[in-house]
C-alpha cells in the first residue's frame, strides 16, 4: 500500500526535524563559526548612483555595502567575503572605462580597487566579464588582491 504524505505534513515534519537536530544547537567548545558574505552582479555599481537617471540613489553600490560588511566583520572573526561575478560591466561607468578610458597595463579598475579596499577574499568571473574582450578583462583583474576562481576557464600561457 503506497504511503501518501501531504505537503503540509512534510513541511511540518521537516521543520520539526531541523528544530530538534543537534546542528541547530549553539556551537560547542572546539567548534568554529564561519560567516559567509557574498555579492553578485555588482555591474560596476561602486557608487550609489543611477547613471541612466543621472541621480544619486541609496539602493545600490559598494559604498553602501561597505557599512554592512564592516558590521558583519565586527560580529564575526571568521568571515569570508566572496563575489559571484558580473562586476566589470553593466552601467555607463563600465562602458566609459572599457571604451573611452581603457584599461592600460598597471591601471587599477575602480571595481577592483573597491573590492581590494573592502578585503574581498575571492571572486569568480561572470559571463559579462568577457563582454569587453580578454585584454580588457586580464588588465582589469590583474590588480586584484584576491584570487579569481574559475573551474571552466583556462588561460593559455
Q: What are the functions of these language-model segments?
A:
Residues 2-5, 9-12, 17, 22-157:
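Acidic, metal/ion-coordinating pockets
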